[in-house]
Amino acid sequence: MGLPKGPEGQGLPEVETREDEEQNVKLTEILELLVAAGYFRARIKGLSPFDKVVGGMTWCITTCSFDVDVDLLFQENSTIGQKIALSEKIVSVLPRMKCPHQLEPHQIQGMDFIHIFPVVQWLVKRAIETKEEMGDYIRSYSISQFQKTYSLPEDDDFIKRKDKAVKTVVGLSDAYKPRRKYRRQRGAEELPDEESRVHSTLLEYGRRYGFSRQSKTEKAEDKKTALAAGLSAAEKVDAHEEDELQAAEEQRIQSLMTKMTAMANEESRLTASSVGQIVGLCSEEIKQIVSEYAGKQSELSAEESPEKLGTSQLHQRKVISLNKQILQKSKHLEELQANHTSLKAKYSDRKKTLTELKDHGEKLDKEQAALEKLEAKADPSMLQNLRALVAMNESLKSQEQEFKAHCREEMARLQQEIETLKAERAPGEKIISGGEPQGALTSTMTHNEDLDRRYNMEKEKLYKIRLLQARRNREIAILHRKIDEVPSRAELIQYQKRFIELYRQISAVHKETKQFFTLYNTLDDKKVYLEKEISLLNSIHENFSQAMASPAARDQFLRQMEQIVEGIKQSRMKMEKKKQENKMRRDQLNDQYLELLEKQRLYFKTVKEFKEEGRKNELLLSKIKAKAS
């Protein structure tokens, strides 16, 4: 692969295809590997080597459960940019797959099959391993699903015999499990060595084994050696020693057994703690248990030995037991009736509440439906104005309430001031009534009138100020509302982004719907043709026997068949013509798409050059201004 380094193309990698024999050999090996792995698209002769190799690599990567960001729709005659982009996406996935071989995008685009071959070989090996793993997993999953629904005869036999076998094994283990017959007495001295402790434990379970008793085989061997040697004296000594050992063992067993007690006696006793627990029970529970025990005992005695009792006694006991049962059942019936009445009352209350809620909900639904109808019929602008007026009315009501509260507070304050003034004036009145001159009374009345006049003036001034404040607040609220109605730049950007997202979603849904419509139309056409074919075959089948009955009918039948075949051929020609037209239209649209891509590239290039020229122009203008200054 050569890279030209001329004065104009220096630094620009120009890919060059190697057409030697080694490249062709590697290409053949790559295609054979892909076909062997299961990628049979590599056999198509109309595809270029780039499409075969890249398609095979993409197929291997997707088989290994890795994602490749490629277009699902195959495009023929891709541009160099599209090929390089596809190669870069494939190369970016290889490190995530831990591929040991390195590969560059220009090697794939330049069809350097010598470097591509090891990567394809590794991908094919990995794809085959993944297929085997998935096959094992699917096989085990299918077996498990089969076993959930169906079963083999061997499994049925095993399930039938399983419970019986388990019961037998459990019964045998319970029958032959070791049972403790003796227990060492509390306070007995501990055994010194481990051998004695083992022997004591075995004795507790009823097993008597000697400490130093030899086995029968050892005895037989000793006898054989003794006979062979002819040592009669040694036999006597051995027999005497064996008797002594046996006597010692019996003595030890007896000494150990004296320190043990039988388990039956131990189990029949009650400990102090169990007695305390029994005594700690409630007296009512003890009485109830005693009465139940007496009743059961009387019933058992009556059932076991009825011949020992008289007829009157048996009848009396039966009457007593029946009376007790009647009392118990009547108490239980009363409890159930009380519970039933309470539950019935609760049920009626809840049912009434539920009906009320349902009626209220239906009323609200009707009102909401009526309001929605009115809103649908009304003018939107008028409705908006009404909503604004309602909001303004609510705000004015709240302001009115606040103003009334403020007026009440102001009136209370002024009344308090009047009371204080009256209290200050009261001593002066007393002086006047006591014989003071009339001038003091006149001055006091003038002062009061002056205060009333000033109070009324201040009150009117306050009222005007409050009206002005309310008008200002209303204007401020209107201005705030107008300012809030104007969206900010951030909101406009957010709206724009949201509109773009909605447009993309709508276009995606539109595209998907269009595909569904196309699929539906195709399947509908297929259904129509299949129905026609079935009806034609049925008519042929029905008329075949009649047509073969006579030569004239057979000739007419053959002519009809020829006409039908000719009609099918004409329909097929029409569909082929339509297919060719669609293909030509697709090619035209593809050419237009490529032209638009070229125009887009030229547009971006022109914009970039324009920005560069603008930057140069600004730089020159700044230099000219600097020189002029």
UniProtKB/Swiss-Prot annotation:
Main localisation: other
Coiled-coil stretches: 231-430, 558-599
Task performed by this protein: Component of the commander complex that is essential for endosomal recycling of transmembrane cargos; the commander complex is composed of composed of the CCC subcomplex and the retriever subcomplex. Component of the CCC complex, which is involved in the regulation of endosomal recycling of surface proteins, including integrins, signaling receptor and channels. The CCC complex associates with SNX17, retriever and WASH complexes to prevent lysosomal degradation and promote cell surface recycling of numerous cargos such as integrins ITGA5:ITGB1.
Lineage: Eukaryota, Metazoa, Chordata, Craniata, Vertebrata
Subunit structure: Component of the commander complex consisting of the CCC subcomplex and the retriever subcomplex. Component of the CCC (COMMD/CCDC22/CCDC93) subcomplex consisting of COMMD1, COMMD2, COMMD3, COMMD4, COMMD5, COMMD6, COMMD7, COMMD8, COMMD9, COMMD10, CCDC22 and CCDC93. Forms a coiled-coil heterodimer with CCDC22; this heterodimer interacts with the guanine nucleotide exchange factor DENND10; the interaction is direct. Interacts with WASHC1. Interacts directly with WASHC2C. Interacts with SNX17 and SNX31.
Signal peptide segment: none
Family: Belongs to the CCDC93 family.
InterPro entries (alphabetical): CCDC93 (IPR039116), CCDC93_CC (IPR019159), CCDC93_N (IPR048747)
Native source species: Mus musculus (Mouse)
Positions of the UniProt region annotated as Disordered: 1-23
Name of the protein in its database record: Coiled-coil domain-containing protein 93
Region (Sufficient for interaction with CCDC22): 1-428
Matches recorded under PANTHER family: COILED-COIL DOMAIN-CONTAINING PROTEIN 93, FIDIPIDINE
Segments of this protein annotated with the region Sufficient for interaction with WASHC2C: 446-629
Subcellular location: Early endosome
